[in-house]
UniProtKB/Swiss-Prot annotation:
Coiled coil: none annotated. Pfam families: Globin. Heme b binds at H63, H92. It comes from Pseudaphritis urvillii. GO terms for cellular component: blood microparticle; haptoglobin-hemoglobin complex; hemoglobin complex. SUPFAM superfamilies: Globin-like. Hb1 is a heterotetramer of two alpha chains and two beta-1 chains. Red blood cells. This is Hemoglobin subunit beta-1. Residues 2-146 form the Globin domain. One of its GO terms (biological process) is hydrogen peroxide catabolic process.
Length: 146
């Protein structure tokens, strides 16, 4: 993947201004509520039976924050995202057996949450760079499935 200086700047700016404790849980909650079949990968998280239960589940919140910190690793290694996620890809494919399509669903939910937070600052150019970044991450996480 080739990144322009503008794309690098946009991605860095987005992540440097995100409140991980707010955005991460919101994105994961949205994914688990909108796509309930994704809940099967979180059976150890306890009660996920209702949207309210999901939104107040501390394990969901903690994992949402963890996901954003994982994305931060990609921001810091934009020229080598696939290698950065090699071990994580193996974990998700071979141990956790996560359907790789779920990464795309979560990235879509994250895009919605970030867009809502940024408001008019989430321009088409910003969205294009953000979605390109997430597409590379999703591809890297799914690499071991191929």
């Amino acid at each position: 993947v080739v990144w322009t200086n503008e794309e690098r700047s946009i991605i860095s700016s987005i992540f440097s201004n995100l409140d991980y404790d707010d955005i991460g849980p919101k994105a994961l909650c949205r994914c688990l509520i909108v796509y309930p079949w994704t809940q099967r990968h979180f059976t150890t998280f306890g009660n996920l039976y209702t949207p309210e239960a999901i939104m107040t589940n501390s394990k969901v919140a903690e994992h949402g924050v963890k996901v954003l910190h994982g994305l931060d690793r990609a921001v810091k290694n934009m020229d080598n995202i696939k290698a950065t996620y090699y071990d994580l890809s193996i974990l998700h494919s071979e141990k956790l057996h996560v359907d790789p399509d779920n990464f795309k669903l979560l990235s879509d939910c994250l895009t919605i949450v970030v867009a809502a937070k940024m408001g008019s600052g989430f321009t088409p150019e910003t969205q294009a760079a953000f979605q390109k970044f997430l597409a590379v991450v999703v591809s890297a996480l799914g690499k071991q499935y191929h």
